[in-house]
From Swiss-Prot:
Cell compartment(s), UniProt: Cytoplasm
Any GO MF annotation of the entry: translation elongation factor activity
Presence of the UniProt keyword Protein biosynthesis in the record: yes
Top-level taxonomy: Bacteria, Bacillati, Cyanobacteriota, Cyanophyceae, Synechococcales
Record gene name: efp
UniProt KW Protein biosynthesis keyword: yes
Entry-linked InterPro entries: Elong-fact-P_C, NA-bd_OB-fold, Rib_uL2_dom2, Transl_elong_fac_P/YeiP, Transl_elong_KOW-like, Transl_elong_P/YeiP_cen, Transl_elong_P/YeiP_CS, Transl_elongation_fac_P
NCBIfam families cross-referenced by the UniProt entry: efp (TIGR00038), PRK00529.1 (NF001810)
Protein keywords: Cytoplasm, Elongation factor, Protein biosynthesis
PROSITE patterns tied to this protein: EFP
A matching Pfam family: EFP
Gene Ontology biological process terms, A to Z: peptide biosynthetic process
GO-annotated cellular components: cytoplasm
Superkingdom field: Bacteria
UniProt protein name: Elongation factor P
């Protein structure tokens, strides 16, 4: 059980048999009446977002999620197949369960698969990934003095803004949370 006073961004709670993640929260103490917590919750399974208000100190069941480090091995139709490299056990997730994470997911990548009551819910990517640029405009030497950017399409199909000096075939490090370029990858 968790108190509504202890809500933090990312906290998971269980309401009506579903897992919800706290996206935003605000403790409100009106001049008259009792305090309450206004929150924005996102259903982990469906992605639906709802606003809910709880009394301050209200106890709610906390959803205990399990994380397992698995490797993305291949795709079968619309399903993404992940393998536990120690037990060789396979786990399948649909494209809907993967969601926005699919734009950075490539075969052989280690990710955390989040499960609840034995069923996989979602994928957590590492904070940064190394991907190759497959499509971008050629950079011209001396283009700008301040360092402009241009769009680049990566090997997974993701599009990020990169500095003008980068070209096709270069490997770059990308922040998966903000979709931003972090730097060139050496080696």
């Amino acid at each position: 059980m968790i108190s509504s006073n202890d809500f933090r961004t990312g906290t998971t709670i269980e309401i009506d048999g579903a897992v919800w993640r706290v996206v935003e929260f605000l403790h409100v103490k009106p001049g008259k009446g009792s305090a309450f917590v206004r929150s924005k919750l996102k259903a982990v399974k469906t992605g639906n977002v709802v606003e809910k208000t709880f009394r301050a100190g209200e106890m709610l069941p906390q959803a205990l999620l399990e994380k397992a480090s698995l490797q993305h091995t291949y795709m079968e139709g619309e399903d993404y197949v992940f393998m536990d490299m120690s037990t060789y056990e396979e786990t399948r997730l649909s494209a809907d369960q993967i969601g926005e994470s699919r734009k950075y997911l490539k075969e052989g990548m280690e990710v955390n698969v989040v499960s609840w009551n034995g069923s996989p819910l979602e994928v957590e990517l590492p904070n940064s990934v190394v991907l190759e640029i497959t499509e971008t405009d050629p950079g011209v030497k001396g283009d700008t003095a301040t360092g402009g950017t241009k769009p680049a399409i990566l090997e997974t199909g993701a599009q990020v803004m990169v500095p003008l000096f980068l070209s096709i075939g270069e490997k770059i490090k990308v922040d998966t949370r903000s979709d931003s370029y972090l730097g060139r990858e050496n080696g």
